Amino acid sequence: MNGPNANGNVIAGSGGVLLGEGRTNHEGRKALLLVRGDEDTSEYENLVSTMGIHIVEKMIQPGKVNPGSYFGGGRLKLIQETLSIKSGAYKQVSLILLHTNATPRQLVAIDQILGIEVWDRVRLLLALFTSHASSVEARTQVRIAKLLADRTILREAVSVQTTGERAGYGGEGATALQVIISSLNRELTTLRKRLGKHTHSAALRREQRRKQGLNTVGLVGYTNAGKSSLFRALSGKKVLVEDKLFSTLEPTLGQMEKSPRILIADTIGFIDNIPNTALASFKSTFAEALESEIVLHLIDASDSLDEIQRKFMTTKNELNERLTEASFDQTFKTMVVFTKIDRISAKHIAMVRQWIDDEQLHDVHFISSISHQGIDELRHSIFQNLFGSLQSIIVHLSSEGQGQKAVHALYSNGYIVHKREHGEQMFLDIWISESELAKLFHQFPHTIEHK
């Protein structure tokens, strides 16, 4: 090992505590991808591509994973020799990617041999989160997750250097790392207090919305399932919509179009095989979608059936995990929504429908946020689940000047599907909660009535 700074190569997200906040833009970097066995790396490579990183070569080593260094020590030394020549495709390689959630022991061992920056799956995701975090809360959440990941590495590095000291290598490196760990712990304390204030404020806002009679529909699903596109289709609100993994990192709230009493909450997507510790600081982000009356579980219908099954189970398990550890007592109705049906054939839809029958799923919808196919039906189902049946109301417009006030109140508290005027009466079909309608009957006793 080349001294304590060498461990900066395995700190989460390009530098972490040793090099300050580290870089956030990794566009154009060159990397080697190390893989054991015949694992499917397509999703991992998509994550890398989202970062703008170019994989120069995918190196595969058959056999069992080395518990101490992931790849065998001999193979790592050959890679180190190849990189040290700095010629051809390897000339600008500045990053080693591991297709695994590596242990601290493995990461430090690889750093000792290769001496350049090393990311496993968790560190790749944290670097991606860092590049997409724009709000103070999101940056705080990501920083906490990074520091927690960093601390495990630093503790392992201290252990390695302390062992080296006993063998006669000296203890200055271990002492320097212990100082950094102390600094890291102090920063974690500060950040957790800051995040606690954000979390408390967000919880108060949600409670206030509930007291005002607002309903929330949360969007959840695997990353890139089409949540942001559906959010825009339902709310009419312009949001970033990209065909990239984790383009949404922080919660976005919007009012359902033409329905002021319903909010849509879009939040971070789920992904397979990520430790709970990496998501622990995002509890308040998930809460925006989970503290809802309805949760829409989105699935990309254009995926293969195997991928649909895998992503469905990942999201389902993550939802259960988040609810188990959550501090709120919230029950919600779940609706399954298959997205991007404009991209698939009738044959594929038939196969998906058979899968739905096999899984015994209920209240399932097929939509396209691009062509808007199925959006009206989904909206109708949301209203039905929230409000029960469509209400038919008569407004007496000549009722001592209260008619127009009553109409305005109905528009403000519900969703008007159809209206018709006849003489001094207005006939409305409206989606509205029983409690809100009761308030309006009380407020306008001689002006509005059931048809």
State the predicted function of each range.
Residues 1-127, 448-451:
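N-terminal accessory targeting/assembly segments
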Residues 2-32, 151-225, 231-232, 320-451:
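C-terminal-of-GTPase-core extension/linker across diverse P-loop GTPases
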Residues 20, 41-49, 81-90, 101-117, ...:
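Conserved C-terminal guanine-recognition region of P-loop GTPase G domains, centered on the G4
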Residues 33-36, 58-62, 97-99, 297-300, ...:
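Conserved beta-strand segments of the P-loop GTPase G domain that flank and frequently precede/overlap
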Residues 38-39, 63-64, 101-104, 123-127, ...:
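Conserved nucleotide-binding/hydrolysis micro-motifs of P-loop NTPases
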Residues 65-68, 132, 238, 268-278, ...:
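Flexible beta-alpha connector loops of hexameric P-loop NTPases
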Residues 124-142:
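Short alpha-helix plus adjacent loop in nuclease-associated cores
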Residues 209-215, 232-263, 271-287:
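Switch I (effector-binding) loop of TRAFAC-class P-loop GTPase G-domains
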